[in-house]
Every structure is written in structure tokens, then in C-alpha cells.
Amino acid sequence: MRECISIHVGQAGVQIGNACWELYCLEHGIQPDGQMPSDKTIGGGDDSFNTFFSETGAGKHVPRAVFVDLEPTVIDEVRTGTYRQLFHPEQLITGKEDAANNYARGHYTIGKEIIDLVLDRIRKLADQCTGLQGFLVFHSFGGGTGSGFTSLLMERLSVDYGKKSKLEFSIYPAPQVSTAVVEPYNSILTTHTTLEHSDCAFMVDNEAIYDICRRNLDIERPTYTNLNRLISQIVSSITASLRFDGALNVDLTEFQTNLVPYPRIHFPLATYAPVISAEKAYHEQLSVSEITNACFEPANQMVKCDPRHGKYMACCLLYRGDVVPKDVNAAIATIKTKRSIQFVDWCPTGFKVGINYQPPTVVPGGDLAKVQRAVCMLSNTTAIAEAWARLDHKFDLMYAKRAFVHWYVGEGMEEGEFSEAREDMAALEKDYEEVGVDSVEGEGEEEGEEY
């Protein structure tokens, strides 16, 4: 069995975790108390959903997940919420004082007091797995726990589980819903530390999600619940192939194989369609070609950047619902002729396609309409470097004045770590630039013959 363990760190990670597990339970027909009426094999079995849920002898399904936060209030909501019976109390780990939006507190001072307990709980979950394939880590870049503690955890996971894949779902800070002035510092410090430990990181830009909620779902003032429900749909689409019998991307390593050309270039761009409110869904026919086209609209991306200015290195289309290969092939053929999709010249312009026949599920009372089919596109494009450039610029503005740095130094960091992290980010931007540059040999002859 190829199990995945989800680790939800900090407030953002935990709240996205809530949305995701709520959706998984609906998709698999698991009740809030963990019972699953449709499951015939009690106490185990080799069903696909067992990658995410373990079964007890009493027929209860328990998420293979750990929730960690350095302060208790957010996880207390899980402990008292609808799904309180779903989780084992030991899976919900809280500290006493928070990281106060300070990477150094999350990584050094406060984080180190709780890390061993967390690793111990992860070890217990890992022991229940017959063939653990890896970890999904959910966190934000901006918070102290999300940035500092995650990077500490990733370092330790690399030591304890060297060969296992680690995928991240990271929330990229947005100006609209900013919670701290020091988000650029935390983001760059955490990216620098986790870069070599993470195999694949799906970034989600709060601003992009915010705009999608406003534009496509007509929510004037989106709340975190709106954002998280949308994010959970995307996470669910990406992990559907792991939880249902799918044909493509059946395990985590396959994501890397398909999307990561070089170890550092591991930030695929996710795009999801259709995002549509129930009122509108009645009047629109969302065919395979329409939703496929929508994936190439920058407006539907999870990170604000423009792929038309970048080049693609890889492209995966994950369909779910009522989709047949014939329609998909037609849709892709149309896109190849119409769209100005530029692949790097050292990479074949193939689209990898996965179809999962389980239609998308929606949370009752949520914002999204129930649709027959949906698609999630994962593409590795050089355009995502724009996101790093924006962040680096904000970092530079503050760091030039050494603003707020004393809070980090006071928690035992050294100023050198800032410049080291910033240099690493500059190198990352450079890497993206170089990947997009055409290789030298075949220059003259094949310029006009890309497509």
C-alpha cells in the first residue's frame, strides 16, 4: 500500500487541513465520526483511499495526518469542531506560545521544544504504514510557525526518512490579506532552508485565490473559509489520483518525475477549472474543451504570473469526472494550434494526461457549483520566477534598512542567515532564467518550427 502522511503546520496549514479533510470525507463517504458505511472490508483492506486513511478494528477511518501549531487556539477549534471524533487526540499537537510571525522563533527557540514530540507522532503514523510513499506538508510562507517550524521539520524529515518524497503546499503571502509586515523575511528564510529538502512545492498565492473568489464566485469580501475551500478543491484534484484508482500520477514520485526537470526547479503552477458559482452553472455548458481552455487563462492560476512570458518545461492535465480520452485529445490539439504555448526547446511538447472517473464533490453550503467534470493543470513554467522576484523585491526594501531584523537576531539568528537566504533566492531566479534560455546547438534551423 502506498500511504501518504499529511502534516499541517501553523494556522494556515491547519485551516487548509480542515477544509481538505472535510472534502476527503465527503468524497469517500466517510462520516464525521470516521465510520464509512460503503466500506466492506473492516479493519484494513487494500482500497485506494487507505493511502490517506487508516482503519481501526472497529471500522473507524482515521486520517493519516498530524496537525501542529505552536499556539493552541486554532487546533482547539478542530478539537471541538464537527470532525473532532475523526482525529486521534495525539494527532493534534499544540504548543503554549506562538511564533509571533517570527521565523527564528518557529525554527529555533519555540520550535525546538516541540519538534521531537511531532517527529515521534509522525513516526507512530509511519509505523502503521506498510509502504509509506511520502509526506504532504501544508503551511504558509508568511507566518512564524508556517515558515520557521516547517523548515525545521523538513530538515528533520530528511534525516529520518531520507528517501521519502516530500511535497509542499505553501501559501504565498499576498498584499490584500497580509497578516504581518515581516512576511517577505519569513518567506525567503523558509524557502532557502527547505529548498534542498522539498521534492515538489505547489505554491498558492492568496491574492490569486482571492481574485478567483471575487471574480468567479461573486464573493465581494472573501474570507479565509472561502479561500480554503477553493484551495481544498485543488489539493483534492492533485491527490485524487492517489486516493482513487487512477491511471496517472498514482504515486508521489510520479509527480516529480513528470514535473521536476532539475531538483531546484520544483515549483509547479497549479490551475483549476471550472470555478463557478451555482447560479451561473445552470447557464453554462462546461465541456472538456472549455475547461481545458480555461486552464491556460492566467486568471485561473493559483499564483499570479504570466505563463505567456515564460516557457513551459512540463505540463500535466488531471481530469476528473465524465471525461473521455477522445475529448481530451481534441481539446489539447486545439490548444496547441491556437495558444501561444512555448515549451523550452530541450523538452518535448507533450501534455501528460490523467483521468479519474470520480466526479468532483462539493461541500454542501459551499460556494462552488456541483459540476460533472473538472480539471487541474500542473505545469512547470519559468514564469513562476515572477513570484520570487516580487518577494525578493519586498525583502530588499526592508532589509536595506535592516527593519525588524533585531527580532530575529534576538531569537538567536545571525544576520548572515538573511544575506545567505537572499543570495540563494537570487540564484533560484537565475536558475529559472537559465532554464528558459535556448540551448546553443540547434539555433539557426528550427526557430520557426516549434509547432
From Swiss-Prot:
EC number(s) reported in the record: 3.6.5.-
Location of N6-acetyllysine modifications: K40
Domain of life: Eukaryota
Post-translational modification note: Some glutamate residues at the C-terminus are polyglycylated, resulting in polyglycine chains on the gamma-carboxyl group. Glycylation is mainly limited to tubulin incorporated into axonemes (cilia and flagella) whereas glutamylation is prevalent in neuronal cells, centrioles, axonemes, and the mitotic spindle. Both modifications can coexist on the same protein on adjacent residues, and lowering polyglycylation levels increases polyglutamylation, and reciprocally. The precise function of polyglycylation is still unclear. Some glutamate residues at the C-terminus are polyglutamylated, resulting in polyglutamate chains on the gamma-carboxyl group. Polyglutamylation plays a key role in microtubule severing by spastin (SPAST). SPAST preferentially recognizes and acts on microtubules decorated with short polyglutamate tails: severing activity by SPAST increases as the number of glutamates per tubulin rises from one to eight, but decreases beyond this glutamylation threshold.
UniProt-annotated location(s): Cytoplasm, Cytoskeleton
KW Acetylation (keyword) present: yes
Molecular function as annotated in GO: GTP binding; hydrolase activity; metal ion binding; structural constituent of cytoskeleton
Cofactor(s) in the UniProt record: Mg(2+)
Gene3D superfamilies: Helix hairpin bin, Tubulin/FtsZ, C-terminal domain, Tubulin/FtsZ, GTPase domain
UniProt-annotated binding residues for Mg(2+): E71
Keywords: Acetylation, Cytoplasm, Cytoskeleton, GTP-binding, Hydrolase, Isopeptide bond, Magnesium, Metal-binding, Microtubule, Nucleotide-binding
Region annotation (Disordered) ranges: 432-451
First-tier enzyme category under EC: hydrolase
GO biological process terms on file: microtubule-based process
Database matches in PROSITE patterns: TUBULIN
One of the record's GO cellular component terms: cytoplasm
InterPro entries membership: Alpha_tubulin, Tub_FtsZ_C, Tubulin, Tubulin/FtsZ-like_C, Tubulin/FtsZ_2-layer-sand-dom, Tubulin/FtsZ_GTPase_sf, Tubulin_C, Tubulin_CS
Residues with the 5-glutamyl polyglutamate modification: E445
Catalytic activity: GTP + H2O = GDP + phosphate + H(+)
Residue ranges annotated as motif MREC motif: 1-4
Database matches in PANTHER family: TUBULIN
Protein family (similarity comment): Belongs to the tubulin family.
Protein name: Tubulin alpha chain
Biological source species: Torpedo marmorata (Marbled electric ray)
